[in-house]
């Protein structure tokens, strides 16, 4: 309970600090953009893995499995160019380290995507060119080891309560119906691929492999017809909802995407009160990262985030001095980003409303909330063990007492029966 009270007090302190700052802040001349957070998926890549009967194994791909392709590099360079145009006048036209901070998961494809993106966002100008023949400059991308990443690599674990929720999700009518409807289809796919452990939760790997091969001009096997690919795609999208929704979505969010959302909320609050962060904060990650965050925000469209798709948070200071948050999702390269509205708030969402509406899906103490609560059955077991332990303890004490008394009798002493002759 102490951890919970301290969590609520921190949230209340953020609200109080923000409110006090807004009361004393003088009005600005015009509405202005103050801070941007980007979360994007890596670009086009090779398959993460293959299946036993696949004629195309790892050697088919120049850099092996799970690696960014030239197409993926171009996708992120183009996204960087689009961001450069969108934030012209907000960001300096040349790279300034005080303005930008980039963090990536520790995967080759996300690190390289961030580097390609920065090449499009900040081509070197003038003195920044270290070679006149190279229109590129090194810009730092920060990361942590995969095993230590508690911000961008989802699903987060180990988390016993989340695993319990997943087991409960498997018992829901929606999951059970989906499983029964696709039982024969999964058997067919398992037979064609040579996979022995194919389930609703793992079939996305088959779709991913076939999709990557098709994208790169490789011929698919006859069984992978357009109808089969469409069905696999739908099951792939179902697997994302299984991870972060279907059942107890809000609690799953607290254990998953809400962790990242908590950091984004802190950054927005900090920039509205002290302006002590870079103007642009970038996260380079995965489709699961985007889905986890968008499910926590309740703005997920139910489909896998495309390569180089980008979720945008923009913090504005209004002419009144108050702050607002706008969200966008760029999931098509040839169109402007789609406006996203947090449920219960207009697209131009006042910052305090944004914080209030997202509070329920932000964990107060992730480690504590991940623990399993003791139910009635657990209590009965504990009581029974305690009773048995007490009885065993008393028996041991009684036995030791008897043994002690027997050993305490003097040598040669024996009881004399009535009527026995004395020597």
Curated annotation (Swiss-Prot):
Topology Cytoplasmic: residue spans: 402-423
Taxonomic source organism: Macaca fascicularis
GO MF entries: acid phosphatase activity
Lumenal side: 31-380
Disulfide bridge map: 159-370, 212-310, 345-349
Gene: ACP2
GO biological process, one term: lysosome organization
Annotated CDD domains: HP_HAP_like (cd07061)
Membrane topology note: Single-pass membrane protein
Catalytic activity: a phosphate monoester + H2O = an alcohol + phosphate
InterPro entries tied to this protein: Acid_Pase_AS, His_Pase_clade-2, His_PPase_superfam, Histidine_acid_phosphatase
Record carries keyword GTP-binding: no
Active-site residues, as the UniProt record annotates them: 42, 287
Glycan-linked positions: 92, 133, 167, 177, 191, 267, 322, 331
GO terms for cellular component: lysosomal lumen; lysosomal membrane
SUPFAM superfamilies with a match to the protein in the record: Phosphoglycerate mutase-like
UniProt protein name: Lysosomal acid phosphatase
Protein family per UniProt: Belongs to the histidine acid phosphatase family.
Stretches that traverse the bilayer: 381-401
